[in-house]
Swiss-Prot record:
Highly expressed in testis. Minor expression also detected in epididymis, seminal vesicle and ovary. Predominantly expressed in testicular germ cells during spermiogenesis. Most abundant in round spermatids and detected at lower levels in elongating spermatids. Disruption phenotype: Male infertility. Testis appearance, size and weight are normal and there is no effect on sperm morphology or motility but there is a failure of sperm-egg interaction and fusion. Spermatozoa undergo normal acrosomal reaction and can penetrate the zona pellucida but accumulate in the perivitelline space as they are unable to fuse with the egg plasma membrane to complete fertilization. No effect on amount or localization of sperm-egg fusion protein IZUMO1. The extracellular domain shows strong structural similarity with IZUMO1 but does not interact with the IZUMO1 receptor IZUMO1R/JUNO. The lineage of its organism: Eukaryota, Metazoa, Chordata, Craniata, Vertebrata. One of its GO terms (cellular component) is membrane. The gene is Spaca6. Coiled coil: none annotated. Residues 1-41 form the signal peptide. SUPFAM superfamilies: Immunoglobulin. Residues 166-251 form the Ig-like domain. It comes from Mus musculus. This is Sperm acrosome membrane-associated protein 6. One of its GO terms (biological process) is sperm-egg recognition. Belongs to the SPACA6 family. Sperm protein required for fusion of sperm with the egg membrane during fertilization. May regulate the expression of sperm surface protein DCST2. Residues 332-339 are cytoplasmic.
């Protein structure tokens, strides 16, 4: 048997090589387009495709080649604004500035007094100065918290981002003697919104943890301060304070309370008696009733013959004598009138 070996000529290999080069070139071009769009994206974040196209049409007409050249010049003029990060609260103001820039370029195109590349360069320089004078966002303050005031808008991808910090703060250890006072302050170093701030307190006894599943609510605590007085061993454990803005958590603080100190000495018998007297419920007070002695009690009880009682006895005797005299006189008068 004879074996045949097929040999490929350079002409047959050339199409496959050319196809590979074309594929690599397409991929490189795609990466360049993506990189370019992400590099000068401030222009793309605050203007629309239709707005940019309209500007170039007013400058160069509707010929596609000239429009592509104009668009490249417009995008290239904003190269200095690559990777810009601005205060998120200034985003609306910057959008208005880009809108005003677009209107200004359209007016320049209508007057046809300067070439488009010069107009684009001047517009980009003005916007760069505007961005540099925007109010800066405060820096992130570690170690924790959802810090809205530090939110930044990234032109590189037209998105906003918060500080890369956890919501949970580190546990603060507190060593308090038995019988003393424990004071917890739910305060963070970063700026909080001015309104709709609430505080929620939770507690888990006996452990040092940040696992929220173990905690139970403390309905009696609502403000940013919490106090325990006097501290007892049952208060040992982890206290958690959640700062909320419109029911959205901004930070969770943890306080581990370690109660130390010996138990109080046993009370003496005198201290026990004194505490019982102090805690005893007062009895009903006795009402003093006035005493009005009778005539027999005045005569039989020598202690009752006070000055007032003697006067009362004399008055009674005089009244009795006068009554008897009057009765005798009335009787004699009746008797004599009958005779």
């Amino acid at each position: 048997m004879t074996s045949q070996r097929s040999l490929s000529s350079p002409q047959t290999r050339r199409p496959s090589v050319m196809g590979l080069i074309s594929l690599v070139g397409s991929i490189v071009l795609l990466f360049l387009l993506i990189f370019r769009a992400s590099t000068w994206a401030c222009l793309f974040c605050f203007t629309t495709y239709e707005e940019r196209l309209r500007v170039c049409q007013l400058f160069v007409g509707r010929e596609e080649t000239k429009i592509n050249l104009c668009r490249n010049e417009l995008e290239g003029a904003f190269e200095d604004l690559k990777d810009m990060k601005i205060n998120y609260d200034e985003r609306s103001y910057l959008h208005d500035e880009f809108t005003q820039m677009t209107v200004s370029l359209q007016e320049k195109a209508a007057r046809r007094r300067e070439p488009f590349w010069l107009a684009f360069k001047d517009a980009a320089a003005k916007l760069k100065r505007t961005i540099e004078h925007l109010k800066k966002a405060p820096a992130c303050i570690p170690p924790c918290g959802l810090q809205e005031v530090a939110r930044l808008f990234h032109c590189s991808g037209c998105f906003s981002k918060l500080c890369d910090l956890p919501l949970d703060c580190p546990v603060q250890d507190m060593l308090v003697n038995r019988g003393d006072q424990a004071l917890f302050s739910c305060i963070v170093a970063f700026e909080l919104p001015e309104s709709e701030i609430t505080y929620s307190w939770k507690f888990v006894g006996g452990v040092r943890t940040k696992d929220v599943t173990y905690f139970r609510d403390m309905p009696g605590a609502h403000g940013y301060l919490a106090r325990i007085r006097p501290v007892q061993p049952k208060h040992g454990g982890t206290f958690s304070c959640v700062i909320l803005h419109d029911q959205r958590p901004l930070a969770r603080l943890y306080f581990y309370l370690n109660v130390t100190g010996p138990p109080p000495p046993e009370d003496t018998e005198l201290q026990v008696t004194f505490r019982e007297v102090m805690n005893r419920t007062p009895a009903e007070p006795e009402m003093i009733q006035p005493w009005s002695p009778s005539l027999g009690e005045l005569l039989t009880n020598p202690q009752a013959l006070t000055l007032g009682n003697l006067f009362l006895l004399a008055a009674t005797a005089a009244l009795g004598s006068a009554s008897v005299t009057l009765l005798v006189w009335l009787f004699f008068r009746w008797y004599l009138s009958g005779n």
